[in-house]
């Protein structure tokens, strides 16, 4: 059968209260000592009796232990304040980022021609100027790319013309050699076929017009 639960309340009888205090105090001091020895803990115990007498135990200097406790309590309080300040800072930064995202989304919709009802005449004029500057930059870039493409095609045209002249010269040389009976008819036909093959293969436009021969002279104009 287990022990009954003892009700904890103030002992009214003065003598009994003093006797109980002495017993419990000694037991508490013993437990503090055992805790410090068994667990290598720094323990400080201070007890004031109802009459104002002080009893203490410390396995170290009790003042040093109290100072250490004060420092630990101060660090804990400051740490809590720092965490609170950091939390407020991150909340503010998060709110700023959400506001910036909203502004960018609104600006993007305005550039697409949406959600214009809320804009004033001044804001619409500013939006118009932004779009015009953007179109100007786009046209400038397109013009730059077109000029580069035209320059490439002109260089390619010159290369093909030079190659055409070279191949025609080769054909004329082969014909002359045949007339001089230095090349047989079979060899002449083979050389002419090879030259013709080499002539027509490079004489093609590479950029999306494959299969069509490049004219002898191309005049390119910018619109």
Swiss-Prot record:
The keyword Electron transport appears for this protein: no
Main location, first listed in the record: nucleus
Residues of the MADS-box domain: 1-61
Positions of the K-box domain: 87-177
GO terms of biological process kind: positive regulation of transcription by RNA polymerase II; seed development
CC per GO annotation: nucleus
Localization per record: Nucleus
Role noted for this protein: Probable transcription factor involved in seed development.
Name under which the protein is recorded: Agamous-like MADS-box protein AGL11
Chain's gene name: AGL11
């Amino acid at each position: 059968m287990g022990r009954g639960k003892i009700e904890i309340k103030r002992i009214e009888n003065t003598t009994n209260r003093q006797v109980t205090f002495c017993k419990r105090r000694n037991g508490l001091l013993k437990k503090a000592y055992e805790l410090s020895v068994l667990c290598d803990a720094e323990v400080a115990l201070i007890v004031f009796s109802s009459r104002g007498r002080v009893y203490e135990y410390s396995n170290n200097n009790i003042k040093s232990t109290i100072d250490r406790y004060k420092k630990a309590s101060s660090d804990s309080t400051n740490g809590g304040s720092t965490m609170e300040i950091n939390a407020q800072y991150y909340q503010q930064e998060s709110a700023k980022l959400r506001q910036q995202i909203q502004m960018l989304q609104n600006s993007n919709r305005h550039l697409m021609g949406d959600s214009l009802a809320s804009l004033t005449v001044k804001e619409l004029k500013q939006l118009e100027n932004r779009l015009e500057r953007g179109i100007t930059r786009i046209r400038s870039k397109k013009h730059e790319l077109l000029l580069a493409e035209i320059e490439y095609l002109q260089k390619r045209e010159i290369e093909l013309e030079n190659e055409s002249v070279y191949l025609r010269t080769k054909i004329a040389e082969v014909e002359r050699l045949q007339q001089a009976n230095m090349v047989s008819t079979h060899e002449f036909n083979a050389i002419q076929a090879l030259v013709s093959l080499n002539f027509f293969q490079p004489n093609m436009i590479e950029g999306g017009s494959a299969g069509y021969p490049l004219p002898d002279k191309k005049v390119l104009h910018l619109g």
